[in-house]
Amino acid sequence: KEKAYQLSQRGSKALIFARAARKTQKAVVDSTNLTKIRAGGWYGNDTIWRSVVDLNKILLHADSAGVMHAAPQRRFFSVIDGIVAGEGDGPVLPDPKYCGVLLAGFNPLAVDICATRLMGFDYESFAQFSRALNLNKYVIMPYDVSAIRCRSNMPEWCDILHQEGSMLEFRPSTGWEGKIEIRSAPNRNKSIV
């Protein structure tokens, strides 16, 4: 019991420290006028999508020795915990968004596309999706986006890839505002798929 109490106390102190650190970081960012772009978090950054696509290729196509193969080497089940998500300037300074959502599926790209759309963003505006959907080698999703089927206990969410508007209305990171939202995306007047 004493050990559990000590761990509990340590966890409480860590949480208090994390909150204080977040407030300090936010104050520094605000006072130095770094609110538009920081840590590479802007729409034109052409690096992170490459890492995301490469990690997904490795996840699916690398064997236990790290050798890449054309055929997937393992089955995959993706779970996104969106019970309390983060919006705005994440992942460093996100604001909590209480959504009460769990997403899951057998393809990482398909699950991410559905999550992106549920958040109110146009997946076609993200380089990681457009590049990953057009791979010729080490294919991540071996079918077209139109083949994705969303199932939900919320009937209005079952057709999210074909609906206009935002479901959860997430606020994008500052460097992405006006670039990825469904309402501002170039294809906003047509079906998403």
Indicate residue ranges for each PLM-predicted region:
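Extended, low-polarity segments enriched in aliphatic/aromatic residues
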Residues: 1-193
